[in-house]
């Protein structure tokens, strides 16, 4: 089919940098660039068709971006616009002269229904994409946790290689901020704005409190209902621990309870208070020293009973001894039948003989 169509070669003398041929064959779109030969001249050969022997083939040249007609071809003026044209006779004359040589580049393009030849330039333009920066403000409802876009701003970035390299290296925007999303937390309406920062997301704040083996979370709630916040001194903590130990060991022998309470009071008081025991002039009445004996099913031993009587008869106790002293009577479980009852070896002896606090107390009472 290609050989049956008449061919015509369009030419332009050397001088320009680039020339494009356009006309009725491509609806004046400027899609067919001409080929530059070694001499610097431009030419292109393509098939032409005529509807009738009197019809004309209109065309024009685009020389370095300017639409110009050629003086080597016939010119038609239509409403002040000049265009070149050829007829079927011009094609026959050129073929008889033997100058109608088909250029390979133009033949393939003409057969492909005048495909656009400036596609590479269009691709270059497409590669230069416009860059935008989108800033969103997101509103978060604290009750439901639902997020919605409160506002959105689109800013076009300037075409700068330095800025592009900076974004690729640092991973930040042109304004130097590491994030463009703003979170608004509210209960009913908009209360506040705060920018999200990466280190806040990776390191949430956790408030630690001293509890019974548990740690509170960010909302101040503990994982156990038994845990509590201690705001006591070291002496109060020690006292609570000793009371818990006494509650746990309530079923054991209570013969040494009086000595434990007295030693606890002695450990708590500083040296300045213990020095008051040496002042005999500070005395209180006998009624200030009381004793409480807890009755049990088993009769107490005689030694403990004599101790309580001795405390009640003595006078002149110092102010520091005004505290209540609980003398728990020692108990002893019942022995099986057939055994002879013997004194309890675990019964505490007279504290005045052991020394310490009770020894000083006995000396002062004398």
Swiss-Prot record:
<dbReference type="InterPro" id="IPR050827">
    <property type="entry name" value="CRP1_MDG1_kinase"/>
</dbReference>
<feature type="modified residue" description="Phosphoserine">
    <location>
        <position position="160"/>
    </location>
</feature>
<dbReference type="GO" id="GO:0019901">
    <property type="term" value="F:protein kinase binding"/>
</dbReference>
<dbReference type="GO" id="GO:0031588">
    <property type="term" value="C:nucleotide-activated protein kinase complex"/>
</dbReference>
<keyword id="KW-0597">Phosphoprotein</keyword>
<dbReference type="GO" id="GO:0005737">
    <property type="term" value="C:cytoplasm"/>
</dbReference>
<feature type="compositionally biased region" description="Basic and acidic residues">
    <location>
        <begin position="265"/>
        <end position="284"/>
    </location>
</feature>
<dbReference type="InterPro" id="IPR013783">
    <property type="entry name" value="Ig-like_fold"/>
</dbReference>
<feature type="region of interest" description="Disordered">
    <location>
        <begin position="159"/>
        <end position="180"/>
    </location>
</feature>
<protein>
    <recommendedName>
        <fullName>Signal transduction protein MDG1</fullName>
    </recommendedName>
</protein>
<feature type="compositionally biased region" description="Acidic residues">
    <location>
        <begin position="233"/>
        <end position="247"/>
    </location>
</feature>
<keyword id="KW-1003">Cell membrane</keyword>
<keyword id="KW-0472">Membrane</keyword>
<feature type="modified residue" description="Phosphothreonine">
    <location>
        <position position="216"/>
    </location>
</feature>
<dbReference type="GO" id="GO:0007165">
    <property type="term" value="P:signal transduction"/>
</dbReference>
<feature type="modified residue" description="Phosphoserine">
    <location>
        <position position="288"/>
    </location>
</feature>
<dbReference type="GO" id="GO:0005886">
    <property type="term" value="C:plasma membrane"/>
</dbReference>
<dbReference type="GO" id="GO:0005634">
    <property type="term" value="C:nucleus"/>
</dbReference>
<dbReference type="InterPro" id="IPR014756">
    <property type="entry name" value="Ig_E-set"/>
</dbReference>
<comment type="similarity">
    <text>Belongs to the CRP1/MDG1 family.</text>
</comment>
<dbReference type="GO" id="GO:0000750">
    <property type="term" value="P:pheromone-dependent signal transduction involved in conjugation with cellular fusion"/>
</dbReference>
<keyword id="KW-1017">Isopeptide bond</keyword>
<dbReference type="InterPro" id="IPR032640">
    <property type="entry name" value="AMPK1_CBM"/>
</dbReference>
<feature type="region of interest" description="Disordered">
    <location>
        <begin position="217"/>
        <end position="366"/>
    </location>
</feature>
<dbReference type="Pfam" id="PF16561">
    <property type="entry name" value="AMPK1_CBM"/>
</dbReference>
<comment type="function">
    <text>Involved in G-protein mediated signal transduction and in the regulation of polarized cell growth in pheromone-induced cells.</text>
</comment>
<keyword id="KW-0832">Ubl conjugation</keyword>
<feature type="cross-link" description="Glycyl lysine isopeptide (Lys-Gly) (interchain with G-Cter in ubiquitin)">
    <location>
        <position position="314"/>
    </location>
</feature>
